[in-house]
């Protein structure tokens, strides 16, 4: 996986993380409740912008993942037992932040009999109990394709359920640990068939072609996906999958136009876009 011929990062990807008062307060709430966020563990380039607006994507079920995807910076290994108080802590933090829309994700918990599905459902219910006016978006793992586990999340009634395809069909086996392209499509199909808005996200710059991205779009449309996010892959460390190319802002604009023409209701496509970027804008598509 080592690649001495690294592609130079272009100017449009160079950002600074500002720390305004809202950023500091968001950081204080997250740390005081011993919460994990994908913003920090995933080294998200938008953390300054989002935390500065008082929004964050909470990561539940711990901060150690049972999988080791070659694009992801989340720690891998043997996770700790689930914290039964975590659903309440997350819900309380959302109340303190006065969020109108909350985004939740998790590590994979292949070590648990139910892969964390009950914990997921309880977290969503607790958020709704303490924050009845807050809408929720959840970015879920594949639950190994077990429909009864995905159904537990569906029955908790979040407004949007997202499951990321991550990359095109050809590259998926190279970078997604224990995940399967077609299994992910079936998870998204199950979400869409439930009536809940289905969303997915991909990274580009891994060596895919525009034709492969269009094929992935067609696959997502065929299973009922309504919202798509597309962002530049950034190699977290030299041990991770190398960046094959930095996609230009112009090509991202083409992907957005193509996706909308193919039938997505919303496409976020730009170099720094990540799964939950501008997630609050997407909720309106669930309320038509």
UniProtKB/Swiss-Prot annotation:
Q: Which residues form the Radical SAM core domain?
A: 51-265
Chief location of this protein within or outside the cell: cytoplasm
InterPro entries reported in the protein's UniProt record: Aldolase_TIM (IPR013785), Elp3/MiaA/NifB-like_rSAM (IPR006638), Lipoyl_synth (IPR003698), rSAM (IPR007197)
Is Transferase a UniProt keyword of this protein? yes
Listed binding positions for [4Fe-4S] cluster 2 are: 65, 69, 72
Record GO terms (molecular function): 4 iron, 4 sulfur cluster binding; lipoate synthase activity; metal ion binding
Q: What is its EC number?
A: 2.8.1.8
Which CDD domains has this protein been placed in?
Answer: Radical_SAM
The coenzyme or cofactor needed here is: [4Fe-4S] cluster
Q: Where in the cell is it found?
A: Cytoplasm
Pathway(s): Protein modification; protein lipoylation via endogenous pathway; protein N(6)-(lipoyl)lysine from octanoyl-[acyl-carrier-protein]: step 2/2
Any one cellular-component term (Gene Ontology): cytoplasm
SMART domains, per the entry:
Elp3
Explain how, and how many, cofactor molecules are bound: Binds 2 [4Fe-4S] clusters per subunit. One cluster is coordinated with 3 cysteines and an exchangeable S-adenosyl-L-methionine.
Q: Which amino acid positions bind [4Fe-4S] cluster 1, per UniProt?
A: 39, 44, 50, 276
What Pfam families is this protein classified in? Radical_SAM
Reactions performed catalytically: [[Fe-S] cluster scaffold protein carrying a second [4Fe-4S](2+) cluster] + N(6)-octanoyl-L-lysyl-[protein] + 2 oxidized [2Fe-2S]-[ferredoxin] + 2 S-adenosyl-L-methionine + 4 H(+) = [[Fe-S] cluster scaffold protein] + N(6)-[(R)-dihydrolipoyl]-L-lysyl-[protein] + 4 Fe(3+) + 2 hydrogen sulfide + 2 5'-deoxyadenosine + 2 L-methionine + 2 reduced [2Fe-2S]-[ferredoxin]
Q: Which domain of life is it from?
A: Bacteria
Mind listing the UniProt keywords for this protein, alphabetically? Answer: 4Fe-4S, Cytoplasm, Iron, Iron-sulfur, Metal-binding, S-adenosyl-L-methionine, Transferase
Q: Which family does it belong to?
A: Belongs to the radical SAM superfamily. Lipoyl synthase family.
Q: What PANTHER family does its record include?
A: LIPOYL SYNTHASE, LIPOYL SYNTHASE, MITOCHONDRIAL
Output this protein's name: Lipoyl synthase
Q: Which organism is it from?
A: Bacteroides fragilis (strain ATCC 25285 / DSM 2151 / CCUG 4856 / JCM 11019 / LMG 10263 / NCTC 9343 / Onslow / VPI 2553 / EN-2)
From the broadest rank down, the organism's phylogenetic lineage runs:
Bacteria, Pseudomonadati, Bacteroidota, Bacteroidia, Bacteroidales
What's the name of its gene? lipA
